[in-house]
């Protein structure tokens, strides 16, 4: 769970060849450490304006001509979240489908998202939870 192997992330983004992301990809290639990955992830999610629009345009164009489950997921998410830079997340994070009765454990500080279905999350108290 969490992030895909860095080599896989580099492969996805290198194949997309998005000019607006090339600097981030080059930096990740040069620094394939958790810090390098965090810098890549935050840099990508911080894109704004024309850079963001151009990067998403290339991603969605590729998704429309690539018949792979991962790109089909990106197109499905785009219907719900048009223009969201998070559409790149499936290329960086492992996509896991749980069946009824399945469970998984996530270490602290592991990025994750629930895309559809119903789930129960059990966690300890933390300082980033609002209680009423």
Predicted regions and their residues:
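Active-site microenvironments in enzyme catalytic cores
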Residues: 1-13
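Conserved AWS/pre-SET-to-SET junction and N-terminal core of the SET lysine methyltransferase domain
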Residues: 72-100
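Generic, ordered loop/turn and secondary-structure boundary motif
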Residues: 4, 92-94, 115, 130-131
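Short helix-capping and hinge/turn segments at secondary-structure transitions, especially at repeat
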Residues: 79, 106-109, 127-128
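Conserved metal-binding segment of the jelly-roll/cupin
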Residues: 1, 97-115
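Long, charge-rich alpha-helical interaction segments
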Residues: 13-80
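C-terminal, non-catalytic macromolecule-binding modules
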Residues: 118-132
């Amino acid at each position: 769970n969490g992030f895909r192997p860095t080599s896989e992330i580099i492969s996805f983004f290198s194949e997309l060849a998005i000019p607006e992301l090339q600097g981030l990809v080059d930096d990740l290639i040069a620094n394939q450490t958790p810090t390098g990955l965090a810098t890549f992830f935050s840099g990508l999610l911080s894109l704004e304006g024309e850079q963001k629009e151009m990067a998403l345009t290339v991603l969605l164009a590729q998704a429309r001509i690539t018949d792979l489950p991962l790109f089909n997921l990106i197109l499905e998410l785009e219907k719900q979240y048009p223009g969201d830079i998070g559409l790149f997340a499936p290329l960086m994070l492992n996509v896991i489908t749980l069946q009824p009765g399945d469970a998984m454990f996530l270490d602290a500080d592991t990025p994750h998202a629930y895309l559809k279905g119903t789930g129960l999350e059990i966690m300890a108290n933390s300082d980033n939870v609002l209680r009423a």
